[in-house]
Amino acid sequence: MFSLQEICRKNIYFLPDWLSEHVIQRLGLYWEKHGSLQRIGDDYVLIQQDLIIPINEALRMAGEEGNDEVVQLLLLWEGNIHYAIIGALESDHYSLIRKLYDQIEDCHDILPLIQDPKIFEKCHELDKFCNILCLVLHAVKNDMLCILQEYKMHLSGEDIQVVFETACRSQKNDIVSWMGQNIAIYNSGVIFDIAFDKMNVSLLSIGYTLLFNHHINNTNENINSLLTQHLEWAAGMGLLHFMLETLKYGGDVTIIVLSEAVKYDHRKILDYFLRRKNLYQEDLEELLLLAIRADCSKKTLNLLLSYLNYSINNIRKKILQCVKEYETTVIIKILWKRKINLIEPILADFIGYHSYTYMVDFMREFSIHPEKMIKMAARESREDLIIKFSKKVCKEPKDRLHYLKSLVYTMRHKEGKQLLIYTIHNLYKACHLESKEMFNLARFYARHNAVIQFKSICHDLSKLNINIKNLLLECLGIAIKKNYFQLIKTIETDMRYE
């Protein structure tokens, strides 16, 4: 029945003083032996205009008394039904318990609210499909050690293992300690795995206490191996406090352990132990190379370099190999600021296979002049980069042509010079030059023994009906002076037709 009275009971927050006790009882707002009930906000009730208590505490009291009418009123006021069940369990009001329990889905939701172990067990028994293991697991999760102590003999070895792991994962340290000291556990080492997983150093400490003080069967070799493994894990996870806790029981921070800290860029761990250990130069160098491969931060690289006094002569080639293989330039920049230049050796490798966009960023980062980039691109047969970098310097084709010509004069690499001349000639083909400019370009080709390009431009001049006899004579003189025999032969052949 959802009557007007029910609506009033649910929403009334104020009882006038002049209402008699009889009227209050008829409204259903009276609690026998306690007095009138009045809702205060959403979470409290006022009893007999005098005592204010939380609505859930009132529900527990009503459940304990078995007062179904008051329970229903308080539930109407949005109290938590779990507290009514707890109260009913305290006084064994099973008719009320059954009525209320039918309205909830799972007794396990109530367990965290219970402090009394006996009530805890009673509540768990409401679910007829649960077993002792289920009870103990929930007891562990809710710090009910006494229940575990009572039922430990009813658990199999496999059950004990499950309970122990649950205690570890729930980080119930007192229960973990008690189990380790009083119950035979098949795989007690799981405590360490969970300690690292939960990053709980207290659990790690308990594990070591159990390992060393309660005679777990491990040989010294196994223990040493275990401690080393834990140091490596902690270093890789950046857990310095785990490392310090482990070192209380043995182990050593070796180069392998520090390598884990380097791999995951845990500079604070490195700093702590490098200050306290005198590592060999070779070990520091290996750590630095590993840091480069792992793309560690500038701070980590600087830290390792500082312990090497920025001396990299022994590993110069290895650094360059790492930079090339892992495409990282952080170390190059750090050393460059310390006046140690590794840009020249790496530039050729980078320009050989990186994109223009990447190389532009590289050029800006290290303040490299475009002229150097173009010459290196020529050495590495990257005509695409020659074109793009020259466009960056000179937007106009004619200006670009003159700029590239100027680079040829200072280019020593033979194949690189030939590629520059080839690029210049392609640029010439794409832009319109005056005859005077074409004559200058022909002389340029002659000076640099560019036979094919010289022959091509002379052919273009002839097609324009321009007399090139004097040009050929001038260029012949250049060729004879420089002993360019093939060019001499080409010019002499052309002169027969002029």
Swiss-Prot record:
Pfam families: DUF249 (PF03158)
Keywords: Early protein
InterPro entries (UniProt xref): MGF_505
Entry superkingdom: Viruses
Conditions for induction: Expressed in the early phase of the viral replicative cycle.
Protein role: Plays a role in virus cell tropism, and may be required for efficient virus replication in macrophages.
Protein name, UniProt field: Protein MGF 505-5R
